[in-house]
Amino acid sequence: MDENKKRALAAALGQIEKQFGKGSVMRMGDRVVEPVEAIPTGSLMLDIALGIGGLPKGRVVEIYGPESSGKTTLTLQAIAECQKLGGTAAFIDAEHALDPIYAAKLGVNVDDLLLSQPDTGEQALEIADMLVRSGSVDILVVDSVAALTPKAEIEGEMGDQLPGLQARLMSQALRKLTGNIKRSNTLVVFINQLRMKIGVMMPGQSPEVTTGGNALKFYASVRLDIRRIGAIKKGDEIIGNQTKIKVVKNKLAPPFKQVITEILYGEGISREGELIDMGVDAKLVEKAGAWYSYGEERIGQGKDNARGYLRDNPTVAAKLEAELREKFQPSEAAREEGDDEGDDE
């Protein structure tokens, strides 16, 4: 760059700093690029698949899937992990369906959880913005986008047609929220539902679509698709669900990784079940017939007994987890490459 251009640029940068404050514009090389802070999800498999050890702070995350697939369970586990690390959590329950007893079973400290059950979508998003701007909340969950009903719809008649109202509300809210989220380093998780597209479908295109328009797809740094793929049985009794979680979008590490984990009724994600599955894959746990062995010790006949052994022996579980973390060490957060990866359906 010639001297005249350098002087002009320096003058422009000086004027910008004077008008908008120090740090409004900076050279990327002038600051140390630090790894993104993350909040663990409660699932070791998912933390590794996300590439940064959990859900990123200072970002928007969308978790979507069919009904009863484990969306709220996953967010409650993330809240529990955040609270264990001394963080503050807020839950905006637009569906008015949060069960505090179930949340407590998953490890959430319900006494310290900030809960809001707003009347309208505008109220929910305004409360979310105020909590984010306070800078004192580490994780904020909105459950769910589909339940964020615009005020005009609530005040109108039952059959009124108000096309695009919710999409406009979400678009406006996210424009306002994202800057505050980055500044306050808050993780904001939006839970979303699926709907079916009506009309002509292109071959190979999914008929499923998330609610609330397209804005959230663009603003989200991480999008997770969570689905129930089978039942977990103990004899004839169903004790949980086998669940597939796919990282559909990830701006911080390579996307499209997927994990199959277990969600047990009344317990949440089975940490011990994950350790066994990952241990077998990594050849740290040996499976001979129905028996599982770790090191010199047999830990159980059948997965349920092996799971019980690890639950009763937390030191053994911690040792196995440490070995697995060492083997599957998440790589450092890659630099964000924008929205041009073609990762939205």
Curated annotation (Swiss-Prot):
One Pfam family from the record: RecA
Keyword entries, A-Z: ATP-binding, Cytoplasm, DNA damage, DNA recombination, DNA repair, DNA-binding, Nucleotide-binding, SOS response
Compartment(s) where it occurs, according to its Swiss-Prot or TrEMBL record: Cytoplasm
GO BP, one annotated term: SOS response
Keyword flag Amino-acid biosynthesis: no
Family statement drawn from the similarity comment of this UniProt entry: Belongs to the RecA family.
Name recorded for this polypeptide: Protein RecA
Organism: Stenotrophomonas maltophilia (strain R551-3)
Lineage summary: Bacteria, Pseudomonadati, Pseudomonadota, Gammaproteobacteria, Lysobacterales
